[in-house]
Design a protein with these regions (language model features):
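Cyclic-nucleotide recognition modules
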Residues: 10, 56-114, 118
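Cyclic nucleotide-binding regulatory domains
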Residues: 19-83
Length: 200
């Protein structure tokens, strides 16, 4: 995450989005860098039948939609606020100027993009598996290892809804629910007050 004060020095402003507000749409030009102060954003696509495919969820402290800024391409997905959100927005040219003058921040962006590429490559291979339980568990374990899920005496809290797990693994919600219950019986997951925990 780039420090808020530094972004503001280069002209970043705060913008507020309500739940379900569209931040940008697929196949539109990329003019800004976005970094979330509070709230949550999802990036998605829809196929010809109208089925939604989730590219990812982004939370406070995270940025999204950067790749087209560097290759002068159109956005490959939509960005939509999933809850009321406050987002720092800075024009592309000012953002690039910041990166040129602050190499540590540039390296941070590169590492962030590399992390996402690794995630997509890993999950693409796992989603090829036909076993729903395997898909769900791999998503959870990857998130534990790379996204700093919170941990308490019950294990790691899985900070995804059943719908989000389904969207990220290509499974129907009903299939996710059955898989989670089966994994609970196998003592690989815990369900406490409707929250899912990964056993440690």
């Amino acid at each position: 995450m780039i420090q808020k004060e530094l972004l503001e020095q280069y002209g970043a402003i705060e913008k507020r989005y309500g739940k379900s507000d569209v931040i940008f749409e697929v196949n539109t030009n990329a003019h800004y860098y976005y970094q979330i102060i509070s709230g949550e954003v999802k990036m998605n696509n829809y196929n010809e039948e109208g089925k939604e495919f989730i590219q990812g969820f982004f939370k406070a402290g995270e940025s999204f939609g950067e790749p087209p800024l560097f290759v002068n391409r159109l956005y490959p997905a939509n960005a939509i606020a999933t809850e009321d959100s406050v987002i720092l927005v800075i024009k592309k040219d000012f953002f690039k100027e910041l990166l040129l003058e602050h190499p540590k921040e540039a390296l941070s962006i590169i590492e962030n993009l590399a992390q996402r590429l690794h995630y997509k490559a890993t999950m693409a291979a796992e989603i090829a598996s036909e076993d729903p339980e395997h898909r769900v568990l791999q998503l959870i374990d990857y998130s534990i290892n790379h996204f700093n899920l919170s941990k308490d005496e019950n294990g790691y809290l899985v900070d995804f809804t059943r719908q989000q797990i389904g969207d990220l693994t290509g499974l129907r919600v009903e299939t996710v629910i059955r898989a989670v219950k089966s994994l609970e019986k196998k003592r690989m997951l815990k369900i406490i007050n409707r929250k899912v925990y990964r056993e440690v």
